UniProtKB/Swiss-Prot annotation:
Note: Was identified as a high-confidence drug target.
Organism: Mycobacterium tuberculosis (strain ATCC 25618 / H37Rv)
GO cellular component terms given for this protein: cytoplasm; extracellular region; peptidoglycan-based cell wall; plasma membrane
Catalytic activity: L-homocysteine + L-serine = L,L-cystathionine + H2O
Entry's family note: Belongs to the cysteine synthase/cystathionine beta-synthase family.
Gene encoding the protein: cbs
Protein name as annotated: Probable cystathionine beta-synthase Rv1077
Gene3D superfamilies in alphabetical order: 3.40.50.1100, CBS-domain
The keyword Ubl conjugation is assigned to this record: yes
Deletion consequences: No change in H(2)S production, no change in basal oxygen consumption (respiration rate).
Length: 464
């Protein structure tokens, strides 16, 4: 009889599936390694086994111990799945951008989940890295796998993922494409494929725009489980031959296309990897065989990527899940009012109240965001907002001096609304807010007010 003794015995051996509809004519063959068919639903199952076994062997993890790990969800599921059989408790620390769906999965496996802010530096006491370190110090018998520095992560992909790809393609693979998060997958599987092919296989990393791997400064992005704002020890930068930066917008759109056109319900980092793989396939030509690793499934993203309202709120929505078309949008209102305005009228926390009032008056606007970088900025880099009325009142009432920093007198950030949302949604939001910050593809692009909406409607909403 063929009966596994535990679900963890079924980790690995995931299939390759050819992509068809999303691949352009004349491009190379693109085969997806479908890692969501692991029992825990992701490629992180592989590293969980290796890390726990190594910790047990070294004595770092003792019977009845507690596993503490900062994770975007998938590593936690893999660790919980293996730990459950071996009697360990699990405490996982997640950034707040991780979907509630994914957090609930961890809880379902019996883990405790601690949520921390995303938009803070790695060494900030509130970051999910720092909080996990503190928990390890505070909990007796705690062990932190630290997937970002644990050599067993890359090793697991070197001994399983890489050999599986080589065997299943009969050594004909020409390119391997994978997203870079901790760096373990591309380091381990990529190193194996380079070695076994004598350097013939080209290794390509896919990375979110803003991540350090592709030359960014670690600026915020919304795709989960990939990219970083620091350099993990598990990542070997000598392995990838090329790294392709992919926007959140392109990643999410491809993720939705994979469900509609390829019947693959996968996560956002999978869409990102496929965007990069298709670029490689077009450049490599029809004789190439590109293997792209799809690390997880899409059921943990139903409230985000596969939710039209969430996609629209960030300005990512290109087509609705039901295929319906939209009428006049918030983006139309912004384009109608913009005229000669710069891309985003803004000020910075370090600028003075005098500077901010001058900017508001120069461009004839009543409110603007306070941002921590120069445009184009990400939504997570918006620190607050200022209005001409509030600043002038503060100055005349003696609560503010013109030489004060804006940071001392700014209000909370304006409510965000996606450029693709309907004008009716803006009308409802403006009942409670004087102004709204418009975001497109996750980036703030302007501000609309009640006055702007009334002007748009009075001039004829249908005129574009």
């Amino acid at each position: 009889m063929r009966i596994a003794q535990h679900i963890s015995e079924l980790i690995g051996g995931t299939p390759l599936v050819r992509l068809n509809s999303v691949v352009p004519d004349g491009a190379g063959t693109v085969a997806a390694k479908v890692e969501y068919l692991n029992p825990g639903g992701s490629s992180k199952d592989r590293i969980a086994v290796k890390m726990i076994e190594a910790a047990e062997a070294s004595g770092q993890l003792k019977p009845g111990g507690t596993i503490v790990e900062p994770t975007s969800g998938n590593t936690g599921v893999g660790l919980a799945l293996v730990a459950q059989r071996r009697g360990y408790k699990c405490v996982f620390v997640c950034p707040d951008k991780v979907s509630e769906d994914k957090r609930n999965v961890l809880i379902a496996y019996g883990a405790e989940v601690v949520v921390c802010p995303t938009a803070v530096p790695p060494h900030d006491p509130a970051s999910y890295y720092s909080v996990s370190d503190r928990l390890v110090r505070d909990i007796d018998g705690a062990w932190k796998p630290d997937q970002y520095a644990n050599p067993e992560g890359p090793a697991s992909h070197y001994v399983t993922t890489g050999p599986e790809i080589w065997a299943d393609t009969e050594g004909k693979v020409t390119h391997f494409v994978a997203g870079i998060g901790t760096g373990g997958t591309i380091t381990g599987a990529g190193r194996y494929l380079k070695e076994v092919s004598g350097g013939r296989v080209r290794i390509v990393g896919a990375d979110p725009e803003g991540s350090v791997y592709s030359g960014g400064a670690g600026r915020p992005y919304l795709v989960e489980g990939v990219g970083e704002d620091f350099w993990p020890a598990a990542y070997d930068p000598s392995v990838p031959d090329e790294i392709i930066a992919v926007s959140d917008s392109d990643s999410f759109d491809m993720t939705r296309r994979l469900a509609r056109e390829e019947a693959m319900l996968v996560g956002g980092s999978c869409g990102m990897a496929v965007v990069a793989a298709l670029k490689v396939a077009e450049e490599a030509g029809p004789d190439a065989l590109i293997v792209v690793l799809l690390p997880d499934g899409g059921r943990g993203y139903m409230s985000k990527i596969f939710n039209d309202a969430w996609m629209s709120s960030y300005g990512f929505l290109r087509s609705r899940l039901d295929g319906s078309t939209e009428q006049s949008t918030v983006g139309d209102v912004l384009r109608r009012k913009s005229g000669a305005l710069p891309a985003l009228v803004h000020t910075h926390p370090s600028e003075t109240v005098r500077d901010a009032i001058g900017i508001l008056r120069e461009y004839g606007v009543s409110q603007m965001p306070v941002v921590g970088a120069e445009p184009p900025v990400m939504a997570g880099e918006v620190a607050g907002s200022v209005s001409e009325r509030e600043l002038l009142s503060a100055v005349f009432e003696g609560r503010a001096k013109l030489a004060d920093a804006v940071s001392a007198h700014m209000s909370p950030p304006l409510r965000m609304i996606g450029a693709g949302e309907l004008v009716s949604a803006a009308g409802k939001a403006l009942r409670d807010w004087d102004a709204l910050m418009v975001v497109e593809e996750g980036k703030p692009v302007g501000v609309i007010t009640r006055y702007d909406l009334l002007g748009f409607l009075s001039e004829g909403a249908g005129r574009r």
